[in-house]
């Protein structure tokens, strides 16, 4: 699976291996509009990346010290509306406020910039494309019969 420090080439290659397009990658990454990440996964970005809003980096550094400690401290993946499914994740990217390196590479002068900008201004298109990509992803090598299970709680095996 792709990691939080992956570059765009790595991400698109890993998604392509599952039959997903770069556009699928970009829209599915929008799932990060909800959720959090531990400091250990974004520390390098907030102290070393140059494509990051300075005020954003400083605010995240307050809860994620450069020296040892705080590795499990959490920060929201969507700084604007972390508990609402919307397109603000993309607004963060356009403002160089992506928490993970692997998020910000979607908007960094590369092939996905136009789509990120579109989603940042068009919530309806994001919702529609996200739904279609989720359905597409659900068809990737599904486990059937006794090999798979439908969980009532994703974290607990039935």
From Swiss-Prot:
It holds the Pfam family peroxidase. Belongs to the peroxidase family. Classical plant (class III) peroxidase subfamily. It catalyses: 2 a phenolic donor + H2O2 = 2 a phenolic radical donor + 2 H2O. One of its GO terms (biological process) is response to oxidative stress. It is an enzyme of class 1 (oxidoreductase). Substrate binds at residue 2. Its EC number is 1.11.1.7. Glycans are attached at residue 48. Its cofactor is Ca(2+); heme b. Disulfide bonds join 39-64. Binds 2 calcium ions per subunit. Binds 1 heme b (iron(II)-protoporphyrin IX) group per subunit. Heme b binds at residue 32. Ca(2+) binds at residues 33, 78, 81, 86. Removal of H(2)O(2), oxidation of toxic reductants, biosynthesis and degradation of lignin, suberization, auxin catabolism, response to environmental stresses such as wounding, pathogen attack and oxidative stress. These functions might be dependent on each isozyme/isoform in each plant tissue. It comes from the Eukaryota. Keywords: Calcium, Disulfide bond, Glycoprotein, Heme, Hydrogen peroxide, Iron, Metal-binding, Oxidoreductase, Peroxidase. One of its GO terms (molecular function) is heme binding. This is Peroxidase.
